[in-house]
Amino acid sequence: MTQYYLSKNYNVLNNAGNKAKTDIEEILSKLGYKNAGLPQTTYSNKITGFLITLAGVLKVLFTISANNVVVVQYPFKKYYSFVCNIIHLKRGKVITIIHDLGTFRSKKLTAEQEIKRLSHSDVLIVHNNRMKEWMESQGYTQPMVCLEIFDYLSPSVNNNTHEPNQKPIKVIYAGALNYRKNKYLYSLNDVMSKWQFELYGKRFEEDKIKDKTLFKFKGFVPSDQLIEQVSAHFGLIWEGDSIHT
């Protein structure tokens, strides 16, 4: 039995989604998995990227054979069901690693549509038990494994320290900063006026903030550089509309 993963074209590498996916490709390669498609590329042109990824998907037809296992990362946009069908046509098995569910993130899929799509996989690797329970509640019946913590690969080391009683308490947030995506950030004035937030990312709408002294906007910083330079008591990972959810 040979184990594979499927690479693709990533139009940009300096965002959280693609960083996570390319890290997984690197980890799988180090574990002895082979790339069933074309080599990883980073063309920003959408047409070029589409053609390269499609060619990589079609190459799977000639790469794998019966009883081979292929790891596919989800979402894989328009290719996911197609590539799963190709693998099963060759009598192989599909393991899917979930990064995001369209039902929640983009809301372009209903739960029923997403479950139907993911049912093409033989095994799912999901974030945690909450996601597993949700999948089961929506009718998913295939085996699932919980990944739990999802970390980055990075050669960077952070040697910054903070004393527990050092004031003000500093919190780092890195991610989408626009009001539409993370409305809760703009409500933190009401509950955390004695803390200080350092924000890394793009499209921060400073004009919507009541007390601008609560935030320090640092702009976008590549992930390895961010790991090396941040200095705070806590890091916050959250996306949402409300401070109450």
Regions found by a protein language model. Name each.
Residues 1-14, 40, 236:
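Nucleotide-activated donor-dependent transferases that construct or modify glycoconjugates
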Residues 7, 31-47, 198-204:
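A short beta-strand-loop structural module common to alpha/beta enzyme folds
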Residues 122-136, 140-158:
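Donor nucleotide-sugar binding/catalytic pocket of nucleotide-sugar-dependent glycosyltransferases
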Residues 224-245:
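Nucleotide-sugar-dependent
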